[in-house]
Every structure is written in structure tokens, then in C-alpha cells.
């Protein structure tokens, strides 16, 4: 069974989603199915079919979450250190073309969210950053073309 690297915060977030799906969403869906059944004929009952579809989606996500949680290799980022970039690092970059500064944290695939600055360990930019250090320049081939970034700061917070 292949381990999946994950930050402590990401692990807690997945556990909370699993709890919510099992203890709140599952009973709500079961109640919706029960109510729809009470309306009689199920063949043309859109409410029933929608509730059954929601149940299928929820149960699939529960199975997925249980798998990720079982395979999680939880890494406490605050205990990491060093000059080289690795999983969990928070990196401040300078886009050499636009002079725009960006801050990213390298996290596991399941906790990645570019809007909040969390990038997947398997993303092109994270792969380019791993093993580098402050002062290095990386080139990232993105859909919009190649970008050069200077690594300004590396932290483990």
C-alpha cells in the first residue's frame, strides 16, 4: 500500500470531511430517500433518483477518504528544517518576467488548492522546486509558456 504524504492540517481536514459525510450527510440523504419513497411510484420519481445519486456520490467519496486516511503519511511541517526545498516547504518566489511575488506551500495531492497557495507535490512547479534552495532560479513550463522564478525565501511553518 503506497503511502500518501500529507500535512497535519490536510489530514485533519480529510478526517473532518469524513466525519461530516458519515454523521451528517449520510443520515440526511437516507431521510431524503425515505421521504421520496413515501411519494409512491419510484419509476418517475425525480426526488428519489436525485437522492439515490447523491447517496452514491457520498458513499464513493467516503470510500475515497477512508483510503487516503489509511494511506496517509502525516508530516508535521513545523518540525522540518533545512536549506533545500522538500515536501511541506513554504516558498516565496519572484516571477522574473512580471516581477510579481508569489508564495506557495508544497502539500499532498488531496490538500492542494492553488487559490490558497497550496500546490500539489506532483505539480510541475513543485517538481521544479524540490531540492532547490534560496537564490536558485527555476524554469517552469506552464500552459501559458515557460516562466522563470527566483527562489527568494524557504520556510517550514
Curated annotation (Swiss-Prot):
Keyword Transcription regulation: yes
BP terms from Gene Ontology: DNA-templated transcription elongation; regulation of DNA-templated transcription elongation
Keywords: DNA-binding, Transcription, Transcription regulation
GO molecular function: DNA binding; RNA polymerase binding
Record PROSITE patterns: GREAB_2
SUPFAM superfamilies per record: FKBP-like (SSF54534), GreA transcript cleavage protein, N-terminal domain (SSF46557)
PANTHER family (UniProt xref): TRANSCRIPTION ELONGATION FACTOR GREA (PTHR30437:SF4)
Family, as annotated: Belongs to the GreA/GreB family.
Function: Necessary for efficient RNA polymerase transcription elongation past template-encoded arresting sites. The arresting sites in DNA have the property of trapping a certain fraction of elongating RNA polymerases that pass through, resulting in locked ternary complexes. Cleavage of the nascent transcript by cleavage factors such as GreA or GreB allows the resumption of elongation from the new 3'terminus. GreA releases sequences of 2 to 3 nucleotides.
Protein name, UniProt field: Transcription elongation factor GreA
Source species: Bartonella henselae (strain ATCC 49882 / DSM 28221 / CCUG 30454 / Houston 1) (Rochalimaea henselae)
Amino acid at each position: 500500500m503506497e503511502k500518501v504524504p500529507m500535512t497535519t492540517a490536510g489530514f485533519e481536514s480529510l478526517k473532518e470531511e469524513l466525519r461530516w459525510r458519515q454523521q451528517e450527510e449520510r443520515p440526511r440523504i437516507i431521510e431524503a430517500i425515505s421521504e421520496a419513497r413515501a411519494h409512491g411510484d419510484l419509476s418517475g420519481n425525480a426526488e428519489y433518483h436525485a437522492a439515490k445519486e447523491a447517496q452514491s456520490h457520498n458513499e464513493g467519496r467516503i470510500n475515497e477518504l477512508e483510503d487516503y486516511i489509511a494511506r496517509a503519511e502525516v508530516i508535521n511541517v513545523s518540525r522540518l528544517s533545512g536549506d533545500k526545498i522538500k515536501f511541506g516547504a513554504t516558498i516565496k518566489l519572484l516571477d522574473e518576467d512580471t516581477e510579481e511575488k508569489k508564495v506557495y506551500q508544497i502539500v499532498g495531492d488531496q490538500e492542494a488548492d492553488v487559490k490558497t497557495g497550496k500546490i500539489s507535490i506532483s505539480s510541475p512547479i513543485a517538481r521544479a522546486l524540490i531540492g532547490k534552495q534560496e537564490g536558485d532560479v527555476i524554469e517552469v513550463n506552464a500552459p501559458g509558456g515557460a516562466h522563470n522564478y527566483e527562489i527568494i525565501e524557504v520556510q517550514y511553518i
